[in-house]
Amino acid sequence: MEEELKCPVCGSLFREPIILPCSHNVCLPCARTIAVQTPDGEQHLPQPLLLSRGSGLQAGAAAAASLEHDAAAGPACGGAGGSAAGGLGGGAGGGGDHADKLSLYSETDSGYGSYTPSLKSPNGVRVLPMVPAPPGSSAAAARGAACSSLSSSSSSITCPQCHRSASLDHRGLRGFQRNRLLEAIVQRYQQGRGAVPGTSAAAAVAICQLCDRTPPEPAATLCEQCDVLYCSACQLKCHPSRGPFAKHRLVQPPPPPPPPAEAASGPTGTAQGAPSGGGGCKSPGGAGAGATGGSTARKFPTCPEHEMENYSMYCVSCRTPVCYLCLEEGRHAKHEVKPLGAMWKQHKAQLSQALNGVSDKAKEAKEFLVQLKNILQQIQENGLDYEACLVAQCDALVDALTRQKAKLLTKVTKEREHKLKMVWDQINHCTLKLRQSTGLMEYCLEVIKENDPSGFLQISDALIKRVQVSQEQWVKGALEPKVSAEFDLTLDSEPLLQAIHQLDFIQMKCRVPPVPLLQLEKCCTRNNSVTLAWRMPPFTHSPVDGYILELDDGAGGQFREVYVGKETLCTIDGLHFNSTYNARVKAFNSSGVGPYSKTVVLQTSDVAWFTFDPNSGHRDIILSNDNQTATCSSYDDRVVLGTAAFSKGVHYWELHVDRYDNHPDPAFGVARASVVKDMMLGKDDKAWAMYVDNNRSWFMHCNSHTNRTEGGVCKGATVGVLLDLNKHTLTFFINGQQQGPTAFSHVDGVFMPALSLNRNVQVTLHTGLEVPTNLGRPKLSGN
């Protein structure tokens, strides 16, 4: 877990961590060193002086802190805001950094962008030296000049991990929220490791927060307005008692923090500097959390924009805790908000659920490591077995095989070393992933233990995403050995003595699978579906990864793949009726695809057998008699479809009227699967139908009524539907006699039998019928 608690800039445990807009964390002192100015601000600054590494960092940190206080004071800086980059130079000139400046200039207008590291900025972090003061000028004058130059400039900070840059507003680095949970976890982690003997006295003394000495000097004063601890030298350099600091009150450092037991019982890392009334500044977190401990810690975290208000709600749009003033008068006024406690519990539950997945993967990884170690032992044992066998065979041919024996032993050893290397590489890789996942899991568990809802919600989204990414890295093949413990080597000792010098290992290479055998006794057809079964021939030693089943189009066309997988039984539905299909299958493995099997010919049913489909019918439709009888519970017309779909061939089915009350208008015909089901069939463009009462009938499509024909239905009548997709026509019959002319021509596509009726009608479906040859002539239509 320690890697989760280290700053990506300094590599040490986090000190006063702040949360960047990209959800990554960085120490506040480190943030001051990596903050940069945009080109608008850089053009007002003098050419920076090249400093040594130590003096540059020291002066940069001191100037940044000093200018942060000056900016907060207000009058001296002319409203330059709290830019933490105020004491930093404009960056060294040159081709590499010039591209970086252009990148920042084009993206930080939006407050968020990306940053591409140049040759002069390794790891994506630019640490700029401070602007030197003009010769002979005082420190205050230098700060005043720097502040005046910053009044018309803006600054940005680049994340050292994802290289995204974010603009700093008038508050500077104080505008970023402090990660109180991470700070508390770091403190608890340090206490858990235990203090080194002889360092307890030093740890009990408050230290200067601006010293870059190792170790830092003890703090001599604490500014109540800035909430920063200073040693004597840093106080004179960074916080002189003149200018905007003249009204600041310097006091003695607070007492040391309580023992670990007391610190664990109270809130940690939440202290903020006390607000002042006269333009005083307050760094985010300041020294209160790190030095004063429980003596100045607040019980509840406060809103950075309304410092006297506690967090009470959670803004869903901005994903941040807010106070009630933010909702009434701030930028969150019209945003969606939810109770803080509810969102805290919800995000904790999400993180816990994600952790369960990572925990399962970690458990599998541990078991996998055990398996790999067993493979190591098996490889050793199998290698020894092969060596012993080889020695025995070579001893039988002492005179002729002496020199050849050494060569063969070398090959076995190389094979063994290769396998061992592969397994060790996989162990190291898996161990690294496991350690990363375990560290992340321990860190997340520590986060869950915290009882700070707002702090938790500040980092929960990022943690959930990281946990999900960590879970996704354990892909399917990651927990499978890359090599086998078996040695695919065989020594053939049969050849004659004259062939001894050609004696070598026969390595069994993976070959393509042989031809699969179709199991014709298990292959069958039912209605418009076919089932095929196959198996591999006996004594097949080649591995099989899967099979490919191919089927033609039922008209002698080209084959196409209809199934790819490991099963040896497959059923294909939705084929054409009265059609002949050819099928074949082949196997494949890592070496390639094997040859095709013999082709099997399958004939689908000559006629269609189907029922009403309970899944596609309207909810008011009532089906019975094994889904062959339909009625309705509503007085309105409702639609039900059949289970078959037709796109070619000639099909005929009949519907027997079991009940007919109060002269309703049932409709019979065909429709697309997307037909509207809460009105009469034929009123939309997805259905072609004939609706009929007790006296006459009409054809209807797109709500267009045509071909009124005398003759209706009653109880006991039979309505026939003839769909001829070879001629693309639809014809209707009543009691064996054609009703009117051909109802519709030029019908093309996929159609399903359809029916609409209300509660006054009940019909029974009869399918599997041959097309009648003795149908009567059509009745003349009335129009």
Curated annotation (Swiss-Prot):
Signal peptide: none annotated. A zinc finger (RING-type) spans 7-42. Residues 513-607 form the Fibronectin type-III domain. Residues 275-293 have a biased composition (Gly residues). Residues 252-261 have a biased composition (Pro residues). Residues 589-780 form the B30.2/SPRY domain. Keywords: Coiled coil, Cytoplasm, Cytoskeleton, Metal-binding, Repeat, Zinc, Zinc-finger. One of its GO terms (molecular function) is zinc ion binding. PROSITE patterns: B302_SPRY, COS, FN3, ZF_BBOX, ZF_RING_1. Residues 247-295 are annotated as: Disordered. Belongs to the TRIM/RBCC family. This is Tripartite motif-containing protein 67. It comes from Homo sapiens (Human).
